[in-house]
Amino acid sequence: MSKKYKHTKELNDKQSPSTGSCTAFYGKSGWEGFKKPYMFFEVADCSSKVRLHNSRLDKRDVFIKKMKRLRNELDRFIVFLDDV
């Protein structure tokens, strides 16, 4: 596997005392026997974290569909909040 991607973005302003970040990853898994590329998108805040990742059964296109659904729902929620 030659391609690798890892990027973390802080979500709060620099002067904020709160923590929050999102991380996107594509690369080799550290799990034994996991031969396919490992992909995840993780969102974290002060006390919690959630990771959407591919399973051994997911193909790359299935994972991409999940990510697009997540993005679309987040966009809808932002539009709603802007109008409240």
Residue ranges, per PLM feature:
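Positively charged, low-complexity terminal tracts
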Residues: 1-84
